[in-house]
């Protein structure tokens, strides 16, 4: 094959040399109509939320209580029923969120992050490792499920370090995806009709086949096959475009982020995604600002779950919601709350036995030690740490059996939080 033939093939495929193909030929089996594992959505409440304003409420006995954890009263704390362990603070839209979803929630309180640093806490809660140099769980899951998936790991922020085990995709503009997926669309008009486009594709494929068959060198044949596979990425983006809902019907950015990830999963392109919402670093005017951030979070989660239910994916999507750390059990001089190492997180969706709470804190928001087998408070037990949560996550998805787990060990055994 001479240089002219190679350039002809490059033109036929629409790919420039020096670029990695979107999908290698070895990954075709990974592009099934349905990915075997549930879609994992990691939702990050950026800035450090206050669990006592949400899922681990601490009220004051009366208005004369000195140095209260919160301004609301103990008797204002809400619960869905006398038999439910789930309780929530009387702030913002907490009532609507918990009443709608308490039976699906697994809340984990009293998690000791051992840090007040934003980046360290975010890393620990999303990788299970306190020190630097470890990929997020979402990246490890994607590497196991299909590292060559075109949009395998979508990220909108939070801890999205991959350590090179899998690419990550930031979807900054869905308009670009639509233009690549539907290059013949010009507004509402077709530049080429479907029959014309189909005939062009047929001639292009026939010509590509002739050029490929004329090449005998195995290395160049493999390169041509990769180019052909890269060109097929346009069809996969078209699938995503077809599965995307009208994003204008979502009232929150978080809801839109979740809808895009769900569309990617339904298209067989996405295994995991980072979603994010901010506003939780409330060093001043804590009650008002924390309530506003929690409203944004809970509204977005309700939109995401509505999308999950719309597609019948209740047992195919697992959502984990966490933050950087918690906030102090007292107000500062600016009526705000500062950083605190004890926090909470929760799960919703596939494989979660709901209406449950694991872990606890005392009235000073200090983590209580647990028996790691029964998960009940035990003075002789251990404090719950993010590494315990991630050991359970790895076991839940089978990541603990993947070689990456040996390369990035957690040095702790799994605990039965999903059992």
Where in the sequence are the language-model features?
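Ligand-binding pockets and gating/stacking loops
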Residues: 1-419
């Amino acid at each position: 094959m001479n240089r002219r033939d190679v350039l002809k093939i490059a033109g036929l495929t629409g790919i420039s040399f020096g670029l990695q193909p979107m999908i290698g030929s070895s990954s075709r089996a990974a592009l099934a109509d349905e990915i075997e594992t549930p879609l994992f959505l990691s939702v990050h409440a950026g800035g450090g939320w206050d669990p006592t304003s949400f899922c681990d409420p601490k009220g004051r006995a009366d208005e004369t209580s000195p140095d209260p954890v919160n301004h609301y009263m103990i008797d204002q704390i809400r619960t869905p029923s006398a038999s439910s362990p789930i309780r929530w603070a009387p702030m913002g839209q907490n009532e609507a969120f918990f009443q709608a979803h308490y039976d699906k929630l697994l809340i984990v309180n009293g998690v000791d992050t051992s840090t007040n640093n934003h980046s360290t806490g975010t890393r620990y809660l999303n990788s299970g490792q306190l020190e630097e140099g470890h990929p997020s769980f979402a990246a490890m899951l994607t590497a196991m499920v299909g590292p060559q998936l075109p949009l395998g790991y979508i990220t909108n922020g939070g801890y999205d370090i991959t350590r090179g085990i899998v690419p990550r995709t930031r979807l900054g503009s869905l308009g670009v995806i639509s233009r690549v997926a539907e290059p013949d669309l010009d507004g509402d008009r077709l530049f080429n009709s479907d029959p014309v486009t189909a005939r062009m594709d047929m001639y292009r494929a026939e010509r590509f086949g002739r050029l490929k068959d004329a090449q005998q060198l195995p290395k160049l044949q493999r390169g041509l096959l990769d180019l052909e596979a890269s060109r097929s990425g346009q069809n996969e983006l078209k699938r995503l475009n077809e599965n995307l809902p009208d994003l204008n019907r979502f009232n929150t950015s978080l809801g839109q982020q979740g809808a895009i990830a769900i569309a990617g999963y339904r298209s067989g392109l996405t295994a995991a995604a980072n979603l994010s919402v901010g506003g939780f670093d409330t060093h001043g005017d804590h009650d008002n600002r924390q309530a506003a951030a929690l409203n944004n979070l809970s509204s977005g989660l309700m939109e995401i779950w509505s999308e999950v239910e719309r597609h019948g994916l209740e047992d195919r999507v697992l959502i984990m919601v966490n933050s950087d750390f918690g906030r102090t059990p007292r107000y500062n001089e600016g009526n705000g709350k500062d950083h605190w190492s004890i926090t909470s997180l929760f799960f919703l969706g596939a494989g979660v036995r709901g209406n449950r709470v694991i872990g606890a804190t005392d009235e000073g928001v200090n983590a209580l030690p647990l028996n790691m087998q029964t998960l009940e408070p035990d003075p002789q037990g251990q404090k719950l740490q993010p590494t315990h949560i991630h050991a359970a996550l790895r076991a839940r998805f089978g990541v603990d059996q993947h070689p990456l787990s040996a390369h990035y060990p957690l040095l702790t055994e799994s605990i039965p939080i999903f059992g």
